[in-house]
A protein has these predicted regions:
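Acidic, metal-coordinating catalytic segment for phosphate/diphosphate chemistry
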Residues: 1-30, 101-102
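A generic structural micro-feature
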Residues: 19-23, 49, 100-108, 126-129
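Short connector loops at helix/strand junctions that flank enzyme active sites
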Residues: 24, 32, 45, 52, ...
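Short, well-ordered beta-strand micro-motif
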Residues: 31, 111-115, 134-136
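Conserved Nudix-box catalytic region and its N-terminal flanking loop in Nudix hydrolases
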Residues: 33-77
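Nudix hydrolase/Nudix homology domain
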Residues: 42, 47-50, 120-160
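A short coil-to-beta-strand element that immediately follows conserved catalytic motifs
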Residues: 78-87
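Active-site-adjacent beta-strand/loop module that shapes the phosphate/pyrophosphate-binding cleft
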Residues: 89-121
Length: 160
């Protein structure tokens, strides 16, 4: 199965139509340990998608703070950021927005590497993710994953 953007985001293009749009910035952690990667799931409008632990950056919060908070919320683990992999972008057309939003959405994902420092694996309670799980890297080809999972693994030089 090929990577699927969340939710059905398309890569940003220089020839994208001009006009008003909204922006959502998020921060995500690639956590690899012993040939396994930690992922959290998100129920999209059409299917379940596995993604890196992470999510939206709140007002007044740094990307680093958001990333660590989201890892805790979605997985039950505390973590330490170990590196910056880079930034990716995508576009979700207005007609594919979740709650019928009238404007397209530019998504910006800040990607980090991290390592677990504590906590116990558990799914998020009352949040946007539905599960958290370690996967062997070899299992990833059979999963529906967000596009930035593949991007983060490639940037980190980790073969899936």
């Amino acid at each position: 199965m090929s990577p699927t953007p969340v939710p059905d985001a398309e890569p940003a293009r220089a020839d994208a139509p001009a006009g008003p749009f909204q922006t959502r910035a998020g921060a995500y952690a690639l956590i690899v340990d012993g040939g396994r990667v930690l992922l959290s799931s998100w129920q999209g409008p059409e299917h379940l998608v596995w993604t890196l632990p992470g999510g939206g950056i709140e007002l007044g919060e740094s990307p680093e703070e958001a990333c660590l908070r989201e890892v805790w919320e979605e997985t039950g683990h505390t973590a330490e950021l170990t590196g910056l992999l880079g930034v990716t972008t995508g576009t979700i057309p207005a007609e594919k927005r979740l709650r019928g939003e009238p404007l397209p959405l530019l998504t910006v994902q800040v990607l980090y590497t991290a390592r677990i420092t504590g906590g116990v694996l558990r799914p998020e309670v009352g949040g946007s993710s539905t599960d958290a799980r370690w996967f062997d890297l070899a299992e990833l080809s059979g999963l529906r994953t967000a596009s930035w999972v593949t991007e983060a693994l490639a940037r980190a030089g980790v073969a899936a």
